[in-house]
Curated annotation (Swiss-Prot):
Domain of life: Archaea
Domain Topo IIA-type catalytic: 14-155
GO cellular component terms, A-Z: chromosome
Protein name as annotated: Type 2 DNA topoisomerase 6 subunit A
InterPro entries xrefs: Spo11/TopoVI_A, Spo11/TopoVI_A_N, Spo11/TopoVI_A_sf, Topo_VI_alpha, TopoVI_A, TOPRIM_Topo6A/Spo11, WH-like_DNA-bd_sf
CDD domains named among the record's database cross-references: TOPRIM_TopoIIB_SPO
GO molecular function: ATP binding; DNA binding; DNA topoisomerase type II (double strand cut, ATP-hydrolyzing) activity; magnesium ion binding
Keywords: ATP-binding, DNA-binding, Isomerase, Magnesium, Metal-binding, Nucleotide-binding, Topoisomerase
Subunit structure: Homodimer. Heterotetramer of two Top6A and two Top6B chains.
Co-factor(s): Mg(2+)
Species assigned in the record: Pyrococcus abyssi (strain GE5 / Orsay)
Binding residue positions for Mg(2+): 202, 254
EC numbers: 5.6.2.2
């Protein structure tokens, strides 16, 4: 199976003015309610499992339409209402001035004692972070579009030209460490893309192995190392590379419940960030490994690891990996018969298989045989 770029489905569309307009429209609504003597309020999409569902057609985990109304003239709501206005004003200033702030900086920048009272605007970051999430859901924009950033994690390597502000560079010519993915990728542009597909790799050690073996050059692909669970910035970057550049996405993780969950968040989104799935998830992504079938296919039985936790048929079980496996077996997005088979095999055998276990064959095996053969033969899970 030859992987080829497809026709782009989206265009680069970041526009700070759109974010400012949404903020201002919401602020004008509140002002008009105050002027007319009404009790001003915000309608906030409800968080929680009871307002999350799996859209079979879109293949995405989505937020439902339940709302909670937050009034100013309500003792139970007034504090959060005021905090929302404070952060809206702060975000407007950030976007207008073209500056960015971390979640921690946003908390400290807005923490102060209200004049004439002993009341602080925020007592802890655990108060400001949820308000920023509320604004994401209320405005329908990413916090990164509001210039609020998170810690950076992950890197890319391959023949793709990146434009980051005034800087323009090729991600295959920055040394073997590649380009570190920033917390915010909304402003990043791709003037030149010379790869056929994206290979998303869970561990930095495996990504480094593939780079050392010159896999990106030989197979003409872009390596994206997530370094564990993919950050929002990495997931957004993967989404953009697929939808704006038409690049197929192949995911390569450890063969365990954690690795498979990493894949599912890249593909379908996550329950916690269901309201952002349409901007972060990539439903067309495919999974190359590791799988339970790989253990038999490549004679890796002697390098498997035992699942962590207590099995369901033992006292106190299921816990750990076993508990996560059973949860995944019941997720709507893992109901495909191929995935059900893999999950049940893991549960039956009680083992997991790491990416690095392929080194038992040889250091070059993963780059010269395992990945090229599986991708060429189309041995990919949906």
């Amino acid at each position: 199976m030859k992987l080829k770029r497809q026709k782009p489905k989206e265009k680069f569309s970041y526009d700070p003015q759109k974010v400012l307009k949404k903020l201002e429209d919401l602020a004008w609504k509140i002002l008009e309610e105050v002027k007319s003597g009404k009790n001003p309020y915000f309608d906030v999409p409800t968080r929680g499992l009871n307002n999350v569902y799996f859209d079979e057609e879109a293949r995405l985990i989505k937020l439902g339409d339940k709302l909670s109304r937050r009034y100013f003239l309500n003792v139970a709501h007034a504090r959060k209402f005021t905090q929302t206005l404070i952060l809206m004003a702060y975000i407007k200033r950030l976007v207008s001035e073209g500056k960015h702030a971390s979640l921690r900086e946003a908390y400290y920048a807005n923490k102060h004692t209200i004049p004439g009272t002993r009341e602080n605007t925020f007592e802890d970051q655990s108060e400001s972070d949820p308000i920023i999430e509320d604004l994401e859901r209320m405005l329908g924009v990413l916090r990164e579009e509001m210039h609020i950033t998170a810690d950076r994690r992950g890197y890319i390597y391959g023949d793709i030209v990146i434009k980051d502000g005034e800087d323009e560079f090729n991600a295959s010519k920055l040394g073997t460490g590649g380009w570190a993915v920033p917390g915010t990728v909304e402003h990043i542009q791709f003037p030149e893309v010379n790869v056929d597909y994206v290979l998303v790799v869970e561990t930095a050690a495996m990504a480094d192995r593939l780079i050392e073996e010159k896999y990106p050059k030989k197979e003409n692909c872009l390596i994206v190392a997530t370094q564990g669970q993919a950050s929002r910035g990495v997931r957004r970057l993967i989404h953009r590379l697929h939808y704006e550049e038409g690049l197929p996405i192949i995911v390569f993780t450890d063969g365990d419940p954690y690795g498979w969950y990493i894949y599912s968040t890249i593909k379908q989104g996550s329950i916690n960030l269901a309201y952002l799935s349409e901007k972060l998830a990539t439903p067309d992504a495919k999974f190359v490994g590791m799988t339970m079938d790989d253990i038999k296919e490549y004679n890796l039985e002697h390098v498997t690891e035992k699942l962590k936790g207590i099995p369901p048929d033992k006292k106190g079980g299921p816990t750990g990996d076993y508990k996560r496996l059973i949860e995944e077996l019941n997720y709507p997005w893992f109901q495909n018969k191929e995935w059900q088979r893999q999950l049940k095999l893991a549960l039956k055998w009680g083992v997991r298989i790491e990416q690095q276990a392929l080194a038992n064959k040889s250091l070059e095996f993963v780059a010269k045989e395992y990945l090229p053969e599986k991708i060429r033969e189309g041995k990919l899970l949906p």
